[in-house]
Amino acid sequence: MEEFQVYLELDRSQQHDFLYPLLFREYIYVLAHDHGLNSSMMSLEGGFYDNKSSSLSVKRLITRMYQRINLSIAANDSNQNPIFGHNNKLYSQIISEVFAAVVEIPFSLRLVAFLEGKEIEKSPNFQSIHSIFPFFEDKLSHLNYVLDVRIPYPICPEILVQTLREWVKDASSLHLLRFFLHEYFNSNSLITPKNSISVFLKSNPRLLLFLYNSHVYEYESILFFLCNQSSHLQSTSFQVLVERTYFYGKVEHLVEVFAKDFQDILGLVKDPFMHYVRYQGKSILASKDTPLLMNKWKYYLVGLWQWHFHASSQPGRVQLNHLYLGKYAINFLGYLSGVRLNSLLVRSQMLENSFLIDNSMKKVDTTVPIIHLIGSLTKARFCNALGHPISKSTWSDFSDSHLIDRFVRICRNLSHYYSGSSKKKSLYRVKYILRLSCVKSLVRKHKSTVRAFLKRLGSELLEEFLMEEEHVLALLFPRASSTSRRFYLYRGRIWYLDIFCINDLVNYQ
């Protein structure tokens, strides 16, 4: 019985006060300000997060809010809020940034380790996004079925508040959180079933990302519990399972059954080959199981969302596919990953007889989704819908060196991210689009022609795009010749273990 309580029982010592430090502890503002400046987000060029709020302005807004009327969600005028005035959207966004920093403090590994007097083990290799793909290469070739899951986001802001209730001790911070979500829900209508998670997080990425991660954490804790204890829960109905009050009674009954040596009656469905991978709002559940059991997991996930999280069950949320002969490719983290068979003919000779042996080996393919990537380039105004490069008119005011440097950084980031592709032709097409778009942008700025500009510039622009790749290959293969390095660049895979954020052009969904 204690084993199940470890998974499901709420630890009251983990609850925290969030609104009190926001109002009365001044060091919170400095901490939030420094955290915002030190947080980096991968944009098109790998830029840093732009912190628009200062600690002094946040403190003034908090004081103004505290001295005015009590917090009220219902406002008489949609244009003027009784707390913030006409700039309610801007002020609420600034305060919510600091509120997000306060909420993140108890969950900071560095802070918890400091308070406990422990050191954080440095393992940067396990933090890289690219570390997932060697895992795919090692595991997918031995698996049969995969569940392609798009985790639903809550359709009502109250679901996010209820998820956070287990970690919050003071009710006033929950009211403040409801106020922020009410502002976003009324002004932008973000929390709707039609929008993706990227749109859901666009207005205030820091606070909503924390709330969404809390929502996903609750979902995954139940999912992992079911995976670990599925042998004990085969006869448990779903509605009884998610209600913790009735769950313990069911478990006690099952313990009595096991005590009477009736284990043979209850078949074991625990799968040791089940693998789970998630990034943002998409997850993959792969297994060597039969399609019948995988279909059961599919309907179980749908029921979990409907009954426990009150999320809408849209068609296509969970798709069951068979990993066979490259007919299905997993669209995950900007790559199309699939399993294909490689045939290898071996001639064997025994005495006077010779015969051929056909050996088939499964191999994981990782390719570039060129159609989606060109769509991202089109949306960013680097090319048209047909993939023809166009000039970047919004960058015409930059200097030549700054404009070229921007294109080189974008090309370098994409080249590094897709270095693990098994087919590089699509990647070279993307680099060609960026290179020619850079030339056309310079031509438009100087009011010249492409031929005249290239004739005057020569091969200097081309060297800017290739210099970074030659430098990386020289570090990886110092003794190899230049020809062999370029051959490996075209044929081999290179996974970088320092890529922590997905590029905006890669994240096209």
UniProtKB/Swiss-Prot annotation:
GO biological process: mRNA processing; RNA splicing; tRNA processing
Keywords: Chloroplast, mRNA processing, Plastid, RNA-binding, tRNA processing
GO CC, any one term: chloroplast
Presence of the UniProt keyword RNA-binding in the record: yes
Major location (coarse): plastid
InterPro entries xrefs: Domain_X, Maturase_MatK, Maturase_MatK_N
Function: Usually encoded in the trnK tRNA gene intron. Probably assists in splicing its own and other chloroplast group II introns.
Name of the molecule in the record: Maturase K
Taxonomic source organism: Citrus sinensis (Sweet orange)
Gene: matK
